[in-house]
Amino acid sequence: VTKQFRSPRFTLLAMAFAVSGCASLAPDSPAPGIAAGMPPAFEQGEADGRYQPARWWTSFEDPVLDNLLDEALSKNLDLAEASARLRAAEARARISKSGLFPQINAGLDSSYSDSPTAGTSFGAVAGGGRLQNETYSSSLAFSYELDIWGKLRNDARAGRADAIASAADLQAVRLAVLAEAITSYFDIVDARHQIALTTRIIDVLGDRVEQSENRYSRGLITSFELYQVRQDFRNVQASLPQRESQLAATEGQLAVLVGRYANNMDELIGGSLTPKLDFAPVPSGLPIDLLAQRPDVFAEGQRLESARYNLGARRAERFPSLSLSASTGSQAGAASDVFDIFDNWVLNLGAGLTAPLFQGGRIQANIEVADAEYAQQTAVYARTVLTAYQEVTTAIERYEEERQRYRFLFSQLDEAEAAAGLQSRRFANGVGSYVDYLDALRAQYQVESSLSSAARDVALARLGVHRALGGSWDDVPQAPDIMAAPSAIQGEN
């Protein structure tokens, strides 16, 4: 028995294992680099810019915002859905990888037969004898397809790349949830400021209407001027319910992002909201490799790899496949002897070669489909990279513009406050009118309103830079490893 297990048949089997996996019909990997003709760095920005940590939103130094985003990351339903999709993709990757390994099955069987003995037609009815037989067997079966042309390997690699793309999709959803939550938060901060300022302006205009009515009664202004003041007052009054409605709608959107009902947000944003604006410029010369950390760019790159490997697998279907099989076990007439493998053992070895001769054009059509999908994904990846570059440059330019706009409005606020203070002193000293003071105070509130909106726009423009770069701009990743996999897949190598 021992000599049989060392026979040339098993040597041939070992050689077949070594030969399998030496070929691949997938196209060559695309040239390294994100896109041809792209500059090595983003030229926008200022040299004295400082970088942000991975949790870049902490630069706003707002614990309310930090808690809100932690809540969103833990309870957002879009993230829960994306996490489930990732688990499914990882499971599919393991399914596609299973074809690389031998299939081993074990079995236990028993059978019983009762038949007439030879020479009788009706057995016991005719007085003849009967033959009764019991058989018990155990088996261990082995089968393996040699991956000579790389079909199974390419299928496994395609599944793995799809799983990595799903992991990047999860990061894209995470970034989108953060961006939407931060946007809603700053919209709420600005809306509350606008409501407070609108209320102050209404009070000022109410006094202005009263003063105008007194002046009209004394013949100092015309009825047209009085109507204009009243109309202005009513217009501002009418804007207050609209602002309050917008605030409620934004709070409702934020509630959905954190997985809550809109009437259950007081503990998160019920108090004072005081985020600190970060006006640090974006550093100049950011390396173009930062685009590689964008989840959408990385995901489409992995889908391009998946399409490449899928094309290789479909090409391999044109060639013969070689499969090996072996089974061993025991067979006995009594259940107690079935595990007596030394006296009752059975061994079967087999090999099969299957070559496609005629498939009605199915194989060639599958190759053409895979080739078209590869070309399609190449275009998708190129478009994604170009779009990402355009979004980064636009976001950096917008951030610089919003910073300048905020500086101008801040200077204008200093002037408006000085004008209101001057009119207040003139009125107190009896050399100025109360109407002039009210007009100056209203102008100050209007500048404060514009400055509040500008502060929100600066924060959202900075958010736009982070989102366009896929997060922070401090950690420049290495060139992405197309075979890097989530931990759940790596653990099976």
Model-derived regions, located:
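Sec/SRP-type N-terminal targeting helices
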Residues: 80-81, 97, 146-174, 224, ...
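Short flexible linkers and secondary-structure junctions
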Residues: 23-182, 322-326, 344, 357-367, ...
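Alpha-helical heptad-repeat coiled-coil segments that mediate oligomerization/polymerization in large
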Residues: 219-222, 388, 395, 430-434
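A short glycine-centered flexible hinge/capping loop motif at secondary-structure junctions
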Residues: 216-220, 427-431, 468-472
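Terminal intrinsically disordered/low-complexity segments used for targeting and assembly
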Residues: 2-74, 121-123, 136, 160, ...
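Periplasmic alpha-helical coiled-coil/stalk elements that build and connect Gram-negative outer-membrane
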Residues: 152, 168-286, 398, 402, ...
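Membrane-embedded beta-strand positions in outer-membrane beta-barrel channels/transporters
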Residues: 69, 137-141, 185, 287, ...
